[in-house]
Amino acid sequence: DKHVKAWNEISKILRGKEITLEELHTKLNGTPNIQNILYFTDGKATKEELEKYSQKKEEYYRQFCKEDTEKFHLVDGVCEFFDHLKEKDIPFTIASASIKENIDFFIESFGLDRWIKPEDIVYDDGTYENKIAMFHKAADVIGIDMKDIRIYEDSNSGIRNAYDAGCEQIVVICDKENEEEFLKRPGVIEVMQDFSFAKEL
C-alpha cells in the first residue's frame, strides 16, 4: 500500500524507524495526517512541522502512485457504480482522510469530477477533529440522515469511525479471506472485493 510506504518514509525521518503492522492498524489507517505526525513525535511537532510533514507524506504518496502504473487505478466496477448512482439520482460523495493536493491529484487522474463536484468532496483540510466529523460533513453535503447512508470503507479505523458516526449500513471492501472477520464488526452489513456487480446494473 502506497500510503503505508509513504508513512514509513515519514516515520524514518521523524523517529528513525519504520511503522509496525500494529501501529498501522490501530493508530495510522484512516486518520488525519496531523494526528499521525503528532503520534510519531509524541505530540511535540510544531504547527510548521505538522504542515511540512503532512505535505511531504503526500508527495511521497503521489510519487509512489505515479511509479506504479499497473496498479494505480479505480477499483473494478467503480465507474459503472458511480454511473448507476448518477442515473438513479442517488446522492453520494467521497469523504477521505487525504489532503487537498491528493484530492486534486485523484480528480485529475481518475476524472472524478464526471460524477462528483470537487467542492462536494470532503477531505482533510485541517478543520476536522477526526474521520467521524468528516462523515458528518459528508452527510450534510448530500443532505441525507446518517442512519440512511451507506458507507463503503476499506480500513479498520474507517469502519469504526463510520459506525461511531451513526452509520448502520457499512460495506467493507476487503480480501476474500478477511470477509468473515469483517462481517462480525458493528454496522457491517456486507463485504466484497470490488464493485464489479455494478457492471450488471
Annotate the PLM regions.
Residues 1-79, 84-88:
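N-terminal helical cap/lid subdomain that shapes the substrate entry/recognition surface
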Residues 83, 100, 105-201:
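Asp-based, Mg2+/Mn2+-dependent phosphohydrolase catalytic module
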Residues 96-98:
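Conserved phosphate-coupling serine/threonine residues in phosphotransfer and NTP-handling enzymes
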